[in-house]
């Protein structure tokens, strides 16, 4: 699962699908396939702004093209995980599992998202604890200086 989350799009591939997407847009109608291919590339970009654009395109497809919802949910879960938006990623993974409850790949993704949420939670607790210790140390130093 880590390989999928760490998979980055090659610049040439992104440029090719971006060109195709923009050409169809210019002509007035972007096909579902073209929009999906471009969104898939964008979600695999190394840049957060590209990933967010890819997610917007996938969300649009999710609304307009019900036949592909399962795939769109999966790649939205991937995109949100890559952006460290774990609660959104979890929602999409769980929605996918409502459609296909035994999909091992998405079950593994859901577990990974859960682990990352736990890690981020622990980091938050560690930062808060560190801040409390710093403030406590400053107050202790201040009180010690006042007593002198």
Language model regions located:
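TPR-repeat structural position
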Residues: 14, 48-51, 86, 103, ...
